[in-house]
């Protein structure tokens, strides 16, 4: 798998190669600058229509981490972290996935990333 090897060359011409482990790659991802946290509460007919599954599927196309879960009051809560532009595109991707017909209201709030997620998961 040569595509996984990282090149650590210097201007001196000396080349070093290494195969990073998962923890190393995760540390690199967590150090990205301009990371933000987006929390969205979706209202409408958003439970029982595959909303969480679709949100997780859409998340695979973006560099975001987070969770999506049903709330007892009938809403769905989505919390995601990543670059702000990526988060905006992700939320737009959710709307364009066919879920916009079920959403009556979308309450979005922004904050600083807490780096508490690994991947994107459905919370049950």
Tell where the protein language model's regions lie, with residue ranges:
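Intrinsically disordered, low-complexity, mixed-charge
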Residues: 4-124
């Amino acid at each position: 798998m040569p595509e996984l090897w990282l090149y650590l060359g210097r201007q001196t011409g000396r080349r070093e190669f290494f195969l990073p482990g998962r923890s190393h790659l995760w540390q690199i991802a967590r150090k990205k600058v301009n990371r933000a946290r987006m929390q969205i509460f979706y209202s409408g007919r958003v439970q029982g229509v595959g909303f969480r599954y679709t949100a997780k599927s859409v998340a695979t196309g973006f560099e975001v981490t987070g969770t999506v879960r049903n709330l007892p009051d009938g809403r769905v809560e989505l919390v995601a972290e990543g670059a702000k532009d990526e988060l905006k595109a992700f939320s737009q991707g959710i709307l364009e996935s066919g879920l916009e017909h079920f959403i009556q209201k979308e309450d979005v709030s922004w904050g600083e990333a807490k780096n508490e997620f690994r991947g994107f998961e459905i919370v049950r």
